[in-house]
């Protein structure tokens, strides 16, 4: 059995880690390098850095922060946010990222997924999906630009397309659950997992350790992303893992 992973997510804006609720009301959490070191020592299995200002404001890739962090990390680092080209990916990998996460640019140019997968290997390419449920159309749609713009691309169609193009992993954020701490969108995540064979990282809604037990018990996703509950020190990575183990689920 593949052991489940717990992955802290650091949303970085203007060089600082921030967190909001449903992608709004951002508040300052701290220095990304310091927080990365804290989670590295606290038992995190991987880290995700999302530069949420990059797509919206178009500033340069945060290469210095990534290099400082990666040089001291002993766990894999995934970096996303505003990656537009193969050259961007090359720079990030050269500065210490282990994987890159593509979202808006992949929706705009799906062939970027194939090109990146062919050049760097699919294990390096994670596709981030900000999933919004539109009650009027009764379907989940992909959003871009940090969750601010909704597309007409349906999530269930998109996940199958990106797998065929060479994505090695999906990072799925349920926008309606983001920061709410009321549990993951189990039904939605289970449906996505039934459509693809690549690993899925679930994001949005993890409010306590039991939510992660439910996630891994009721879906076959590979990892759970956590932000608010860890940043606010409501719990720790090890505490979450201990509860998961008590639930009879193998975790790293």
Swiss-Prot record:
Quaternary structure note: Heterodimer of HisH and HisF.
GO molecular function, one term: lyase activity
Main localization of the protein described in the UniProt heading: cytoplasm
Organism: Staphylococcus aureus (strain bovine RF122 / ET3-1)
Entry keyword set: Amino-acid biosynthesis, Cytoplasm, Histidine biosynthesis, Lyase
Record-given protein name: Imidazole glycerol phosphate synthase subunit HisF
Protein task: IGPS catalyzes the conversion of PRFAR and glutamine to IGP, AICAR and glutamate. The HisF subunit catalyzes the cyclization activity that produces IGP and AICAR from PRFAR using the ammonia provided by the HisH subunit.
Pathway(s) served: Amino-acid biosynthesis; L-histidine biosynthesis; L-histidine from 5-phospho-alpha-D-ribose 1-diphosphate: step 5/9
HAMAP family: HisF (MF_01013)
InterPro entries linked to this entry: Aldolase_TIM, His_biosynth, HisF, IGPS_HisA/HisF, RibuloseP-bd_barrel
GO biological process, alphabetically ordered: L-histidine biosynthetic process
Subcellular location: Cytoplasm
Family the entry assigns: Belongs to the HisA/HisF family.
Taxonomic superkingdom: Bacteria
Active-site residues, Swiss-Prot/TrEMBL: 11, 130
Catalytic activity, EC: 4.3.2.10
NCBIfam families according to UniProt: hisF
Pfam families: His_biosynth
GO CC terms of this entry: cytoplasm
Catalytic activity: 5-[(5-phospho-1-deoxy-D-ribulos-1-ylimino)methylamino]-1-(5-phospho-beta-D-ribosyl)imidazole-4-carboxamide + L-glutamine = D-erythro-1-(imidazol-4-yl)glycerol 3-phosphate + 5-amino-1-(5-phospho-beta-D-ribosyl)imidazole-4-carboxamide + L-glutamate + H(+)
């Amino acid at each position: 059995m593949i052991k489940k992973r717990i992955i802290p997510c650091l949303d970085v804006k203007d060089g600082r880690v921030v967190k909001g609720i449903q992608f709004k009301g951002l508040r300052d959490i701290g220095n990304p390098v310091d927080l990365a070191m804290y989670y590295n020592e606290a038992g995190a299995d991987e880290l995700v850095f999302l530069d949420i200002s990059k797509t919206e404001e178009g500033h340069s890739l945060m290469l210095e922060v990534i290099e400082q962090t990666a040089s001291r990390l002993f766990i894999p680092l995934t970096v996303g946010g505003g990656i537009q080209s193969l050259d961007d990916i090359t720079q990030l990998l050269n500065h210490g990222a282990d994987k890159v996460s593509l979202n808006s640019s992949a929706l705009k140019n799906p062939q970027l997924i194939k090109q990146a997968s062919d050049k760097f290997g699919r294990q390096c390419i994670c596709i981030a999906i900000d999933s919004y449920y539109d009650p009027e159309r009764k379907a989940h749609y992909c959003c871009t630009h940090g969750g601010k713009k909704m597309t007409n691309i349906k999530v269930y169609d998109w996940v199958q397309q990106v797998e065929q193009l060479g994505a090695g992993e999906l990072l799925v954020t349920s926008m309606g659950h983001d920061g709410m701490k009321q549990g993951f969108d189990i039904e939605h995540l289970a449906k996505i997992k039934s459509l693809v064979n690549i690993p899925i990282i679930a994001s949005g809604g993890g409010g306590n350790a039991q939510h992660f037990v439910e996630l891994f018990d009721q879906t076959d996703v590979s990892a759970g992303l956590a932000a608010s509950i860890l940043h606010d020190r409501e719990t720790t990575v090890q505490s979450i893992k201990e509860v998961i183990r008590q639930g009879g689920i193998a975790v790293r």
